[in-house]
């Protein structure tokens, strides 16, 4: 099978140039031929990528360990692979918690989608707060931080900064201040190196 990545690997092999992939890892199971081409190359050195399910589970665990049980989800775009991976992790974290704590159950909202704007994040947070008066946590995901900023602003306008913990993967420039003043309760993220 000929793909953009197999073409890039071939070009690097032909020209003796090293190649690293960013953001996605080659699946040995789903893309066996591409994986093998990369493995056979002297010049393909690996990928740097996020483990979205692990990251999502970590965010949920931060909230559960803080005592939050009614978690609102704000996604980026419906069907986005990054969002779907994180959502898988959120669900896995809550499922594990509920199995281990049958008398202290947690729940996730259905996601509200914010797009990539602060206004979208604000509207999504407002909708979640209106739908669930017991909401005690929000996880805005994706969009490069703008939806997160909008969600934080909505929580602040509602006077609920002390009542609703906000965690995210998007690192804001003022993250330290936000963690200190309580407008954010935690952060999880990072990348992994995956050499073949």
What are these language model-derived features?
Residues 46-72, 85, 120-125, 171-175, ...:
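Hydrophobic alpha-helical segments within soluble ligand-binding/sensing domains
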Residues 1, 24, 75, 142, ...:
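Short secondary-structure boundary segments
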Residues 1, 45-46, 70-79:
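Short beta-strand segments enriched in small/hydrophobic residues
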Residues 14-19, 42-44, 66-71, 97-108, ...:
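Loop/turn elements at helix/coil->beta-strand transitions in domains of secreted/extracellular proteins
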Residues 8-54, 58, 76, 172-180, ...:
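Flexible loop/hinge segments that line or gate small-molecule binding clefts
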Residues 1-15, 89-90, 107-178:
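Hydrophobic alpha-helical
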Residues 79-88:
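Glycine- and acidic-residue-enriched helix-capping/strand-helix junction motifs
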